[in-house]
Amino acid sequence: MGLFDKLAGWLGLKKKEVNVLCLGLDNSGKTTIINQLKPSNAQAQDIVPTIGFSIEKFKTSSLSFTVFDMSGQGRYRNLWEHYYKEGQAIIFVIDSGDKLRMVVAKEELDTLLNHPDIKHRRIPLLFFANKMDLRDALSAVKVSQLLCLENIKDKPWHICASDAVKGEGLLEGVDWLQDQIRAMKT
């Protein structure tokens, strides 16, 4: 670590690093959301389904995020739990237009919340009710009701309506997450 890094750390100017898990069913928009949060010169032009997981980084005014973009395909979801201990926050993405798989999303969320590495931690949960641009998309309120988010009493959580392709609703969510993480670190 160089002199400038040490000085910045002492003065509180160095960005705090935080590990975030990005979870949700396949085709919910996880990778597209993460891509939109990166600087425009670092964004991928083509988004392909994630196999296993990928690691992406982006920064806000006060935090440096390392995001574990976990595949939502059924055969890879069992990998999620291997990263729970490392996560300091969770982004859970839901396809608001996929009413048929809302039950599966709820089952995966319940499994996550009841896992020993998550259950007793006060870890912030950010939900993106994604694909709001679709004509028959469920509202964020309806998604919240179907996932029974009101039953989450021991963790801070927030849900945002989003359109990952256009980037709508993403900054609101990341701002909330940043505030939660900063509050935990003080």
Curated annotation (Swiss-Prot):
It is a peripheral membrane protein. One of its GO terms (cellular component) is axoneme. A lipid is attached at G2 (N-myristoyl glycine). Its main location: membrane. GTP binds at residues 24-31, 50, 69-73, 130-133, 164. GO terms for biological process: cilium assembly; determination of left/right symmetry; gastrulation; intracellular protein transport; Kupffer's vesicle development; melanosome transport; pectoral fin development; protein localization to cilium. Expressed in brain, heart and eye. Isoform 2 is expressed only in the retina. The keyword Cytoplasm applies. It is found in: Cell projection, Cilium membrane; Cytoplasm, Cytoskeleton, Cilium axoneme; Cytoplasm, Cytoskeleton, Cilium basal body. Keywords: Cell membrane, Cell projection, Cilium, Cilium biogenesis/degradation, Cytoplasm, Cytoskeleton, GTP-binding, Lipoprotein, Magnesium, Membrane, Metal-binding, Myristate, Nucleotide-binding, Sensory transduction, Vision. The keyword Nucleotide-binding applies. InterPro entries: Arl6, P-loop_NTPase, Small_GTP-bd, Small_GTPase_ARF, Small_GTPase_ARF/SAR. Mg(2+) binds at T50. It comes from the Eukaryota. SUPFAM superfamilies: P-loop containing nucleoside triphosphate hydrolases. Pfam families: Arf. GO terms for molecular function: GTP binding; GTPase activity; metal ion binding. Belongs to the small GTPase superfamily. Arf family. NCBIfam families: small_GTP. This is ADP-ribosylation factor-like protein 6.
